[in-house]
Amino acid sequence: VEVRQLAQMNGHASFNEVFMTDAVVSRDDLVGEAGGGWKCAMTTLANERRSFDRARDVGARKGRQGKIFADLEEEFAIANEPYTWYPQRAGRVDLILQRAMETGAIKDPAQRQDIARLHIMAESAKWTGERAKAAAKAGKPQGPEGSLGKLAASNVARLAARVHTAICGNDALLTGPNSPKEGIIAEILVSTPAISIAGGTDEIQKNIIAERVMGLPKEPRVDDGPFRDVRRNTSGTTTKS
């Protein structure tokens, strides 16, 4: 079993590809039921999402005294290292106003308008996400809020990248200690495209909104069936497994 890191254009490697060559797994190592891989995968993802909540709890406890808290902080830092760029992929709206005041861009009426529009969009996306969390906590069925919030976050990130570029000019592309925010602005520019892909692409979110909210018909699909029924080619002979 070979694991290879996938280099990203922002210089990080948060994901990998796994190659299994002549790998054999014992029946004793079967997780769940045979043919129930999808259920196992969804359960794993659900627990992974909950782990981010626990990670936030650790962050809230940061700085507390005691060996237990110190061990938790160290464990969290190691686990979180590949994802240190995640705040940048959201656009870092929190840096916009400060940079505009430092560079004098705040005096430009057009840029002030873009900054105001960005903050309005960011707050709207935040409140939409809060509604989705509140509905889930109340045990209500999943509504359109999740997809709407995800799509809004993508729009916010793209606009934030454009506003950062307008404020910093050519310096937005610089990295290193003498660059704007020590290279954070440049990392924002090459990280924001990820928000439109991770957690379901913008196109997937639009499909969900179209089908579940607007009641539009689903797109035709040739793969609409169990994976076990997908036709395969084995040793030159087409079989159905």
Tell what function each PLM region has.
Residues E2, E17-F19, S124, S196, ...:
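Structured core elements
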Residues V1-R92, Q98, P217-S241:
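FAD-binding core of flavoproteins
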Residues T21, V25-S26, A46-S51, E130, ...:
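Short, well-ordered loop/turn and helix-capping segments at boundaries between secondary-structure elements
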